[in-house]
Amino acid sequence: MALAGALALGCSLTWAQAPNYAIDPTHTFVNYENGHYGTTTNRGRFSTKDGTLYFDREKKEGKVEIVMDISSVNTGVDFLNRQLQGKDFFNVADYSTGKFVSDKFVFDGDKVSEVHGQLTLLGKTHPVVLKAQKFNCYINPIFKGEVCGGDFETTIMRSQWGVMWGLQFGFEDAVKLIIQIEAIKMK
């Protein structure tokens, strides 16, 4: 339940290549799923604040930095949202953003298959590997320019980031992250 925020992403890397895409925050979200009591799955979503992408399909290179707004956590239940924002979970008073920074895209032929990076949440940074479910670039008729985007998944252990609440009485440590990302080519 808690570590969906995991994909909080930030802009701090020094890149040899300049970012050539800007993250579209209206199409970029981190969703999470966390089981509890062996019954149902809790789900929620975090919005993104900012981010950049460098992508070169010909060179088979990619880098991404995304900043996530942890205070935007939305489960559809106001009480649970407030609980997740508190000190027992995401402590948004001290850690209002999270970030994901990657400097390695893995390709299978011409397709992006994985994105390796570092996830920072609650001031702790750990490596994660995002598996591409799909990724593509196309000419967007609204923006009249190229947009690249895709869906990625990974499973993390929230205890690595210090989110321990509920582990002793039925909330699972494993959190599945489902990341939707779109980025618009800069002119």
Regions found by a protein language model. Name each.
Residues W15-K187:
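Low-complexity, acidic/polar, glycine-enriched regions of mature
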Residues A2-S12:
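Bacterial N-terminal signal peptides
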